[in-house]
């Protein structure tokens, strides 16, 4: 029978000092036999996805204590990728994931907490907390802040839906008037919550459902809707049950590594491919799998991408649907239901509610459930009122979207595409693979060949795109922006958005060892591995080299002879200490980022730290 971890600090005469300090936090004699549960919050006023979380930790804590636990809250950092985008701040985004994971480990282990409720939401916060949860392997439930309502405005006598990416594209489009750009900017992000499309934050929050670590509705129920409060109330009660199951009944099925098994990771990736999720999810799932000591690799993702169709299409791949529409169509469970009927899921998995996948689908899939309360929850809709307050409205759609032929979520027979929304490509400068979000690629450019325009920083590429130096047919190559080379693996949302602004969204390709925002669409290929800074062949590409992209056949090829590439590699190595570094880039890199770069692996490993350098 496992012993409560917290007993280390609450029992025995030699822990009198620790108990004295616990008493100063409000604990009493009656509390010293109860489980201590960490409420891991991420409130900040910097990030719209987290601005409403201040009081939600208290809400969870009250439920924990009512159920017989002791709740202790702390906060992690949270970087807003959208605000950090397009300048030096983006260097810090991905590294913040490791800091978040480490900070959770530090706090939980330093104070011997028994379990956790993780209140996350945005791009690196959910992955960081997920990595920590699987590293620590103590009972955990995730409950995120929820998606933002889609923006809406009237253009050309038509009401259209908007999000952050629209503001970026219109702001850079010289054909758009100042007044229209301002109108879109003011309408794009109307409420608190994670940006309203299937961007990285919402993708990851959806995947926690498929991993079994959050409750049904977590990925899609709007931040502003009153129904979301119930997820927080349930999490506080349920975590105490899970904690007691493990520590008092020796039931290891309550532990996250036994819930988020390899089968669950395969289900999560299957969901990701089917819903056209952000390419960043590949990085984060690979990283989380390593923390769980699960053998889940790019090869597994490649195999899944070849058999899973696209059953859901959401912004940025279309402007017709946003997360509020996914929820109306049944949310994550709705997509999982269609995947299950297609025979594409592992059914022998459970979630934090203790339900198997078939049981979860029977209760929560709107196509089969008989539960009116569940159907009512999935009718939760937007209010269209600007607010930073959680649970501030209770509007509902008149009807559910259960049309699996033409609705937001489709059945296998009516799939948007027989190929899924993500693909792994391999070739002579991506020997370990690269990732493309096929959901956002126009059919006309699934095969594409063009001359390379090579840039060794995102800034130089942006200047060239906006300066008219990139023309139709070009393949823009941005290198030395990987985890080690950036350092920090910047997102390339501005270059891809500016290609659209210049009318080149369907006429050019962009390839990088960096990564993309979940808001990216177009022929945008990232995570090229090995990265240039690690001696990857992307560092050998020269201006004018022809690059052939073949998404249907999962290929990407630099059309240069092996002999020529060998000669270029020899010349690169001859640069000595300067080998595999950018030639003409001035960038101030802090000590903190240099420390990150010294241990960073390429994207095919999840951009995690190289344990071999630490003796691990």
Curated annotation (Swiss-Prot):
Binds 1 [2Fe-2S] cluster per subunit. This cluster acts as a Lewis acid cofactor. Keywords: 2Fe-2S, Amino-acid biosynthesis, Branched-chain amino acid biosynthesis, Iron, Iron-sulfur, Lyase, Magnesium, Metal-binding. The modification N6-carboxylysine is found at residue 124. Gene3D superfamilies: IlvD/EDD C-terminal domain-like. One of its GO terms (biological process) is isoleucine biosynthetic process. It is an enzyme of class 4 (lyase). Its cofactor is [2Fe-2S] cluster; Mg(2+). GO terms for cellular component: cytosol. [2Fe-2S] cluster binds at residues 122, 195. PROSITE patterns: ILVD_EDD_1 (PS00886), ILVD_EDD_2 (PS00887). It catalyses: (2R)-2,3-dihydroxy-3-methylbutanoate = 3-methyl-2-oxobutanoate + H2O; (2R,3R)-2,3-dihydroxy-3-methylpentanoate = (S)-3-methyl-2-oxopentanoate + H2O. Mg(2+) binds at residues 81, 123-124, 491. The keyword Lyase applies. The active site is at 517 (proton acceptor). Pathway: Amino-acid biosynthesis; L-isoleucine biosynthesis; L-isoleucine from 2-oxobutanoate: step 3/4; Amino-acid biosynthesis; L-valine biosynthesis; L-valine from pyruvate: step 3/4. Its EC number is 4.2.1.9. It holds the Pfam family ILVD_EDD_N. InterPro entries: Dihydro-acid_dehy_C (IPR042096), DihydroxyA_deHydtase (IPR004404), DiOHA_6PGluconate_deHydtase_CS (IPR020558), ILV_EDD_C (IPR056740), ILV_EDD_N (IPR000581), IlvD/EDD_N (IPR037237). GO terms for molecular function: 2 iron, 2 sulfur cluster binding; dihydroxy-acid dehydratase activity; magnesium ion binding. Homodimer. Belongs to the IlvD/Edd family. Functions in the biosynthesis of branched-chain amino acids. Catalyzes the dehydration of (2R,3R)-2,3-dihydroxy-3-methylpentanoate (2,3-dihydroxy-3-methylvalerate) into 2-oxo-3-methylpentanoate (2-oxo-3-methylvalerate) and of (2R)-2,3-dihydroxy-3-methylbutanoate (2,3-dihydroxyisovalerate) into 2-oxo-3-methylbutanoate (2-oxoisovalerate), the penultimate precursor to L-isoleucine and L-valine, respectively. This is Dihydroxy-acid dehydratase. It comes from Escherichia coli O1:K1 / APEC. The lineage of its organism: Bacteria, Pseudomonadati, Pseudomonadota, Gammaproteobacteria, Enterobacterales. The gene is ilvD.
């Amino acid at each position: 029978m496992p012993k409560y971890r917290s007993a280390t600090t609450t029992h025995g005469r030699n822990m009198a000092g620790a108990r004295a300090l616990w008493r100063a936090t409000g604990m009493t004699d009656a509390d010293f036999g109860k489980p201590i549960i960490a409420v891991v919050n991420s409130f900040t006023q910097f990030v719209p996805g987290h601005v409403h979380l201040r009081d939600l930790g208290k809400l969870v804590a009250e439920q924990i204590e009512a159920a017989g636990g002791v709740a202790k809250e702390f906060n992690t950092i949270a970087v807003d990728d959208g605000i950090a985008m397009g300048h030096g701040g983006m260097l810090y985004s991905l590294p913040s994931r490791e800091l978040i994971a480490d900070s959770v480990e530090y706090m939980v282990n330093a104070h011997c907490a028994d379990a956790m409720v993780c209140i996350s939401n945005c791009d690196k916060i959910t992955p960081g907390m997920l990595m920590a949860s699987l590293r620590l392997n103590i009972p955990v439930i995730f409950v995120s802040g929820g998606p933002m309502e889609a923006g809406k405005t009237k253009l050309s006598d038509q009401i259209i839906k908007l999000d952050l990416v629209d503001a970026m594209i219109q702001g850079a489009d010289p054909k758009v008037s100042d007044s229209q750009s301002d109108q879109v900017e003011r309408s794009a992000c109307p409420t608190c919550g994670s940006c309203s499309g299937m961007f990285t934050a919402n993708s990851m929050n959806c995947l926690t459902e498929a991993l079994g670590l959050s409750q049904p509705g977590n990925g899609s129920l709007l931040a502003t809707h009153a129904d979301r409060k119930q997820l927080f109330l349930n999490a506080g009660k349920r975590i105490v049950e899970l904690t007691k199951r493990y520590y008092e009944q020796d039931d290891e099925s309550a532990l996250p590594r036994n819930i988020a098994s390899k089968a669950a990771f395969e289900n999560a990736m299957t969901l990701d491919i089917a819903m056209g999720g952000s390419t960043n999810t590949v990085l984060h799932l690979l990283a989380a799998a390593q923390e769980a000591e699960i053998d889940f690799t790019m090869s597994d993702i490649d195999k899944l991408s070849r058999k899973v169709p696209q059953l859901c299409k959401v912004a940025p791949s279309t402007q017709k649907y946003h997360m509020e529409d996914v929820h109306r169509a049944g949310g994550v469970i709705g997509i999982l239901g269609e995947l299950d009927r297609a025979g594409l899921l592992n059914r022998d998995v459970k979630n934090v509610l203790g339900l198997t996948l078939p049981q979860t689908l029977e209760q929560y899939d709107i196509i089969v459930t008989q539960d009116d309360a569940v159907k009512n929850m999935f009718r939760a809709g937007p209010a269209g009122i600007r607010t930073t307050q959680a649970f501030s409205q209770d509007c509902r759609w008149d009807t559910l979207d259960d049309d699996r032929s033409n609705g937001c979520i489709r059945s296998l027979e009516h799939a948007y595409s027989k190929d899924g929304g993500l693909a792994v490509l391999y070739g002579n400068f991506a020997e370990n693979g690269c990732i493309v979000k096929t959901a956002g690629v126009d059919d006309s450019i699934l095969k594409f060949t063009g001359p390379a325009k090579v840039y060794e920083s995102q800034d130089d590429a942006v200047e060239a795109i906006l300066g008219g130096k990139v023309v139709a047919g070009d393949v823009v190559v941005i290198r030395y922006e990987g985890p080690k080379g950036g350092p920090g693996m910047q997102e390339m949302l501005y270059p891809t958005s500016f290609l659209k602004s210049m009318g080149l969204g369907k006429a050019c390709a962009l390839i990088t060892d960096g990564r993309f925002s979940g808001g990216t669409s177009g022929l945008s290929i990232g995570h090229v591995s090995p990265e240039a800074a690690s001696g990857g062949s992307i560092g050998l590409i020269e201006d004018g080299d022809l690059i052939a992209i073949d998404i249907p056949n999962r290929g990407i090829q630099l059309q240069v002879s092996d002999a020529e590439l060998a000669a270029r590699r020899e010349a690169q190595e001859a640069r000595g200490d300067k080998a595999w570094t950018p030639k003409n880039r001035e960038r101030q890199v802090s000590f903190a980022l240099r420390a990150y770069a010294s241990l960073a692996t390429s994207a095919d490993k999840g951009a995690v730290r190289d344990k071999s350098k630490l003796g691990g």
